[in-house]
Amino acid sequence: MNYLPIFIDIKQKPCLVVGGGSIAYRKINLLLKAYGQVTCIAKSSCKNVAKLVNNKKIIYIERSFESSDVNGQVLIISATNNATLNKKVSELASQNNIPVNVIDSPDLCTFIMPSIVDRSPILIAISSAGKAPVLARIIRAKLESTLPHAYGKLAELAGNFRDQVKAKFSRIEDKRYFWEEIFSGIIAEKVFSGKIQEAKADLQAQLNNTVEAQVGAVYLVGGGPGDPDLLTFRALRLMQQADVVLYDRLVSDRVMELVRRDAQLIYVGKECDNHAVPQGDINQLLVDLAKEGRRVCRLKGGDPFIFGRGGEEIETLAENGIPFQVVPGITAASGCSTYSGIPLTHRDYSQSCRFVTGHLKDGSMNLPWHELAIEQQTIVFYMALNSVEYLSGQLIIHNMRPDMPVALVEKGTTPEQKVYITTLKELPNLVENETIHAPTLIIIGEVVKLREKLNWFDAKPISSKK
């Protein structure tokens, strides 16, 4: 190691920043976050520094730096574009044994400022020892995207119970095991969901041994349309900590690769007239697994509340007193249209959009066809590949133009995506003559014409215009 990573307590202690520009402002903000008493010395200041002065957050001295300014300081940062001045500040600080940092000059520093992931009281510092600051910032960004902001609240909760845990467990191993269970379990998830008081009560009950049988939890997670990059941070976190994953046919293989490696996987996918597990059995299985104390991820393609029967599943959970949370996902209509270069609404072509299922409860398609056939709107059909002849006929009967543009998006947002462009009249012929597989989304409306201009993701569409 070129540097020893340490954390310095500057709370209510005098810190000096030389310079009043935008870089100085960023450093001042860091010092203020650590409750340092900041003095800024510069001939002029930027608007943000001036605002701090007006709000009495810092002391500002409008003049050139003088040698005596280092007296009494516990930490100094020089953030000017004057190399001679920066060197002078560094030398004076070093002579007085005061830690000093000079921006973009590692050779003049006795300490360097890392990139910081702040989940106070949890702090993560990333440094490249001054070799590649941009790389350190990229690493920081990756960490920012994976660590919930509520980790700080979890640490504070643990701190409040630290003495009780020390009193209860004499062996270090027992303490460690207890905290590992807390930090990776349901109590932590309650903190992440903002249920601090519930988490506090559960932790206290666990310490008091009043929890007879720890009930698990169910995470109803939207897996998006296929591209794993479209998962939310929360979805990914819950997928990676679940003990059991119940997944659908529409969840892509690349999304499934991100679930916890040692989790039990249970396939409960459905196809037309072929349900691997009936919906009622799925609902009960979620209850049974949670009652065993397991963390269950119910992973669905798209969004669980848009034609995903998620509402039915959590109704059963609520009736049985099972804790659950729902994580929205990017629905297929949004993902597939975006990756096809087809905006669902457009000022010139469509002022509204309707999502319609082509697979109704009783097997019929008893839809408000006269409403669907009006102009200036986009219709998106889910699960309608086997019903294209009927839906095409009904829309034409209800006065939608036979030449209305139609797009079929097969396996949208994935590397296997295919987009077929046709018209409402020719839609049945296209499906009959081409080998098109589910999942396929059908988009109907003038906005489909924009694909030729706005397509960004895949190759040219397969067309069947006649």
Swiss-Prot record:
Pfam families: CysG_dimeriser, NAD_binding_7, Sirohm_synth_M, TP_methylase
Active-site residues per Swiss-Prot or TrEMBL entry: D248, K270
Chain sites annotated for binding S-adenosyl-L-methionine: P225, G301, G302, D303, I306, T331, A332, M383, G412
Phosphoserine sites (modified residues): S128
EC number(s) from the headed UniProt entry: 2.1.1.107, 1.3.1.76, 4.99.1.4
Biological or metabolic pathway of the protein: Cofactor biosynthesis; adenosylcobalamin biosynthesis; precorrin-2 from uroporphyrinogen III: step 1/1; Cofactor biosynthesis; adenosylcobalamin biosynthesis; sirohydrochlorin from precorrin-2: step 1/1; Porphyrin-containing compound metabolism; siroheme biosynthesis; precorrin-2 from uroporphyrinogen III: step 1/1; Porphyrin-containing compound metabolism; siroheme biosynthesis; siroheme from sirohydrochlorin: step 1/1
GO biological process: cobalamin biosynthetic process; methylation; siroheme biosynthetic process
Region (Uroporphyrinogen-III C-methyltransferase): 216-466
Annotated Gene3D superfamilies: Cobalt-precorrin-4 Transmethylase, Domain 1, Methyltransferase, Cobalt-precorrin-4 Transmethylase, Domain 2, NAD(P)-binding Rossmann-like Domain, Sirohaem synthase, dimerisation domain, Siroheme synthase, domain 2
Molecular-function annotations in GO: NAD binding; precorrin-2 dehydrogenase activity; sirohydrochlorin ferrochelatase activity; uroporphyrin-III C-methyltransferase activity
Record's keyword terms, sorted: Cobalamin biosynthesis, Lyase, Methyltransferase, Multifunctional enzyme, NAD, Oxidoreductase, Phosphoprotein, Porphyrin biosynthesis, S-adenosyl-L-methionine, Transferase
Catalyses which reaction(s): uroporphyrinogen III + 2 S-adenosyl-L-methionine = precorrin-2 + 2 S-adenosyl-L-homocysteine + H(+); precorrin-2 + NAD(+) = sirohydrochlorin + NADH + 2 H(+); siroheme + 2 H(+) = sirohydrochlorin + Fe(2+)
Precorrin-2 dehydrogenase /sirohydrochlorin ferrochelatase as annotated region, ranges: 1-203
InterPro entries named among the record's database cross-references: 4pyrrol_Mease, 4pyrrol_Methylase_sf, 4pyrrole_Mease_sub1, 4pyrrole_Mease_sub2, CobA/CysG_C, NAD(P)-bd_dom_sf, Siro_Cobalamin_biosynth, Sirohaem_synt_dimer_dom_sf
Domain of life, per lineage: Bacteria
Positions with a binding annotation for NAD(+): S22, I23, K43, S44
SUPFAM superfamilies: NAD(P)-binding Rossmann-fold domains, Siroheme synthase middle domains-like, Tetrapyrrole methylase
Job description of the protein: Then it catalyzes the NAD-dependent ring dehydrogenation of precorrin-2 to yield sirohydrochlorin. Finally, it catalyzes the ferrochelation of sirohydrochlorin to yield siroheme.
Family note: In the N-terminal section; belongs to the precorrin-2 dehydrogenase / sirohydrochlorin ferrochelatase family.
Protein name per the record: Siroheme synthase
Source organism per UniProt: Vesicomyosocius okutanii subsp. Calyptogena okutanii (strain HA)
